[in-house]
Every structure is written in structure tokens, then in C-alpha cells.
Amino acid sequence: MAFTTRRRVEFRDTDAAGIAHFSAFFFWMESVEHELLRAAGIAVVDRDGDGQEVSWPRVSASCDYTSAVRFGDEMEIVAGIASIGRTSLTYGFRFTHEGRPVAEGLIVAVRCLMHPGRKPQPVAIPTELLDRLAPYRLPDAPAGPA
């Protein structure tokens, strides 16, 4: 089962031609990612069992565009877990407007211990979190973790 939500193209999301600016899709993907995590009962920033801060920095993001949307258009966004690695999640996103494909994107996020002033340290995704994410696996997603 994928996660489905909606977003309306706001004036701030458009370019001089009144079309949704490419960068807005990255904001929408991150926003929907956070919404999916909340639906799964997972905090974006949390503490592990030892009280250390844990979060999900993005290490890759991409988006391919197939048609334009404009100010006021409402899109349906379908998101889900495309693949799971030992420390990473790959989210897939599909944007449509009135049934017409608009864009598809991917975000790769890595579960990390966050140490102020130091590089984030990747850590394994706990089984409990994998279980919470299971309902959001995309139908054609590999079984993982890799």
C-alpha cells in the first residue's frame, strides 16, 4: 500500500511563466516523506535507546518531469518505500494532476546518529521501524534490506 496525499500549487511555487518551478517538487517530496513517516509513527528526528539523536539525512534526490502544473492546480502525490537497505530508505514519489502524470521522483535517506559538529554516522534501521514501514512498501519494491 502506498501513501497518498494532495498538494495545491501555490503562487510561491511557480516561475515567471506561472508553471510550478522544478525546485518545488523537492520541497513537496520532503514534505510528503515526513507525512509518510508520521503516518507510520516514526519521528524525523528522534533519540535512540542510548539517548543519542537520530535522523534521516538525504544523500540523493532526483525528479523527472513529464508535464506542467500551474498555480492553483491540485496534485495527487503517491509515495512509498521503493527499497530498503541496511541503513537507508529509498522513497518513490508519483505526482499526477487530474489523472495526468506530472513527475516522478526519488529520495534516498540514511538513518544516522547525529553528532553536533561531526559527520552523521549511518546506523542500521531497527526491525521495529522496518515493521512500521512495511505497509508503505511500493508494490513492485524489492524485499530488502540489502
Where are the language model's segments positioned?
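Terminal targeting signals and extreme-terminal segments of soluble enzymes
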Residues: 1-76, 82-146
